[in-house]
Curated annotation (Swiss-Prot):
Gene3D superfamilies: 1.10.10.410. It comes from the Bacteria. It comes from Salinispora tropica (strain ATCC BAA-916 / DSM 44818 / JCM 13857 / NBRC 105044 / CNB-440). The lineage of its organism: Bacteria, Bacillati, Actinomycetota, Actinomycetes, Micromonosporales. Belongs to the GatB/GatE family. GatB subfamily. The keyword Ligase applies. PANTHER family: GLUTAMYL-TRNA GLN AMIDOTRANSFERASE SUBUNIT B MITOCHONDRIAL AND PROKARYOTIC PET112-RELATED (PTHR11659), GLUTAMYL-TRNA(GLN) AMIDOTRANSFERASE SUBUNIT B, MITOCHONDRIAL (PTHR11659:SF0). This is Aspartyl/glutamyl-tRNA(Asn/Gln) amidotransferase subunit B.
Amino acid sequence: MTTTLPAYDEVVARYEPVIGLETHVELGTNTKMFCGCPTDFGGAPNTRVCPVCLGLPGSLPVANRAAVEATIRIGLALNCSIAEWCRFARKNYYYPDMPKNYQISQYDEPLCVDGYLDVEVDGEPVRISIERVHMEEDTGKTLHVGGATGRIHGATESLVDYNRAGIPLVEIVTKPIPGAGAMAPEVARAYVTELRDVLRSLGVSDVRMEEGSLRCDVNTSLNLPGEQWGTRTETKNVNSLRSVERAVRSEMIRQASVLEGGGRITQETRHFHEDTGDTTSGRSKETATDYRYFPEPDLVPVAPDPTWVAELKAALPELPRLHRRRLQQEWGLSDLDMQSILNAGAVELIEATIAAGATPTAARKWWLGELSRRANEAGVELADIGATPEQVAELQGLVDAGKLTDKLARTVLEHVVAGEGSPAKIMADRNLEVVSDTGALTAAVDEAIAANPAIADKVRGGKVAAAGALVGAVMKTTRGQADAKTVRELILERLGVQG
């Protein structure tokens, strides 16, 4: 089998990818899915548990109405049909973090089916079909101690915390997505991005991928044009938007390498490694038969009242696509400008910066310029760069007030990103404020003129452009803390020349 990985362009020239995504969303309810234990994060291990979520004999679950309502709202926002009748099922498997040795989920009768989510990739619309949206409970958490990677291999002991067991989850499963071609990684990222925005607008979850409240499994397969779809792999728990895109691309390249070497793709789960961008084998992928699903005997079926569903639909908030369209009109942006904001993942950041007092133009300038550059260099999402919308608005306010030049503002922003505090504090602590003392500026200008008589004579003789050298000398004297426009005006005034 070949060990040489083909170039991505070679992969998409020869093979057609098919992708699919399974997304687990941790709902922001106050209590667990089937008991009254609190869901808030951070308690000591095994303190947020009870006989129900520990699966002790004789305990009986009761479905959380708030979780059912949140699931219906998600289904409606994803254009799903809401079942008139659905029921829970037991998904049987054995693992230390599963106290009952089964998970209460839904199988053949989910709450929401046959929806879709429209996304945009490079300005082109793509419709992603949703197969199902169903409720289930989360598992506990296993901590492997002693291994170098935090995994079971090499660990000396494993500890189990059941605080997370029973937390309400919603699983959103797409139908297979063929036809994306070379854009398959971008389509996957666009879908998860749009889904995250929809969930956030509904207020059903904080959808923090880095904290696990939004977890994404990516299915990938390759086939030759005109042939049956290939064997798929499932890359588990991809924890950032950037990683979703990288995981699809990496797995496409890996599968092509296997196929080109005469090998066969194994149906399995795989782990994505953030540091290398590679996937490694996890375990063989189970089928539905392996889980021995059967109806949950301890829970009655759920039959949402159509009137209730209609009320929930009528109360849905403005969803992200309509929200962005309205903002584009309010901000007076072209489709291309709006697309650049979408591509950077900056809609909410810019909107919040405007709400904090900045103009749309200024907010776009900072988030799509200096901050995007820093995020790309650091390999992080723009929202994680270390600056808040409020800080960016404050920074622009200092520029507008004449206390900072754009150059000084970029210096201040560097320290904001480093976590040193607010722009005003950094400006004061580092003495970065624009020199506004007229006497000090006049002295610096006179010094520059005296030190450069030949240049001064050129300016007096009508070569006004030569004043740039004198401006540079003053800026050097003031360590860049003077306003260049003000300095130029003062130089021309002192030389008796009109600008």
